[in-house]
Design a protein with these regions (language model features):
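Short, Lys/Arg-enriched N-terminal segments with co-localized hydrophobic residues
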Residues: 1-3
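Structured catalytic-domain cores with a bias toward divalent-metal coordination
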Residues: 20-271
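Sec-dependent N-terminal signal peptides
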Residues: 6-15
């Protein structure tokens, strides 16, 4: 029997290595004692962006939701996270418009779509690390309008048919202003709002998670911390502070048993 168990283990490991689908991901639902709005957080869609998956895992572990609900999927692209690659089956964030039936990400894409379209979900955040530091005007190769880091990303100004949270630019601007008023680790870490104007200007972004959400009348934003910030603790703190701003806008009440402005304390919990 011990030999059989060993053989089963080997078969299991080999089948995992040569799996024809990406691993399933876990959804955590944190519900307050008082009902309210529901925030859906997607992390780890790109496997080489640790700020985008450590932050939601940290949120799941160390936050309590008192009013409203927060649904967290911290690791939707596990195979790529393990490989520390953007997407070992191709870019997962470019599969929300069309996807072939034999794509290894198909099951996970369908699962994410069904979560986005869930009637309970009021707003979606997709967490990333992006290169450089977004600036409205070109400064140099790192600080420029084509960079993604330290920005809240929107696909358009507004979802016109939507009263609740449809004012994407206004919401993102509030988040930006509050983040920049708070403590930044370096002055050049300040946040911006990047509007990709997806429908008119960006064919690649038309394949993305947030654009899928927006075209289905679901407010969605990407939070991008900079890949040029090499300190993971700093990135996680920026991600968490961004998420907290969205929770405040959504009237989601929460508590945490640590000081978010205490770098050492967050670092200790993280590692």
């Amino acid at each position: 029997w011990r030999h059989m168990r060993f053989i089963f283990l080997i078969i299991f490991l080999i089948s995992n290595i040569y799996a024809n689908t990406n691993k399933d991901f876990t959804l955590y639902k944190k519900d307050g004692t008082t009902s309210g709005h529901t925030l859906l957080i997607i992390g780890g869609i790109h496997g080489d962006e640790p700020g985008g998956y450590f932050a939601p895992a940290f949120l799941e572990k160390y936050y309590t939701i008192k009013k409203g609900s927060v649904w967290i999927a911290p690791s939707v692209n596990i195979d790529s996270m393990i490989a520390n690659q953007r997407g070992i089956y191709g870019d997962m964030n470019r599969k929300f418009s069309t996807i072939s039936k034999d794509d290894k990400d198909l099951k996970n894409i369908e699962k994410i779509k069904s979560l986005i379209l869930d009637k309970k979900v009021d707003l979606i955040l997709n967490l990333h690390d992006g290169h450089g530091f977004y600036r409205q005007n070109y400064e140099n190769a790192i600080f420029n309008p084509r960079a993604w880091g330290q920005a809240t990303i929107i696909d358009q100004d507004k979802i016109h048919s939507l009263e609740k949270f449809g004012n994407l630019d206004e919401i993102a601007s509030t988040v930006r202003d509050n983040l920049n008023k708070d403590k930044l680790f370096q002055d050049h870490h300040y946040f911006g709002v990047k509007n990709t104007e997806t429908k008119a200007k960006d064919e690649q972004q038309q394949l993305s998670l947030t654009f899928f959400a927006v075209t289905n009348n679901k407010p969605a934003f990407a939070i991008e911390t900079s890949k040029n910030i090499t300190d993971l603790t700093e990135k996680v703190i920026y991600q968490l502070k961004s998420i907290e701003e969205f929770m405040r806008i959504m009237d989601i009440e929460f508590s945490r048993n640590f000081d978010i402005n205490n770098y050492k304390e967050v670092q200790k919990l993280l590692f």
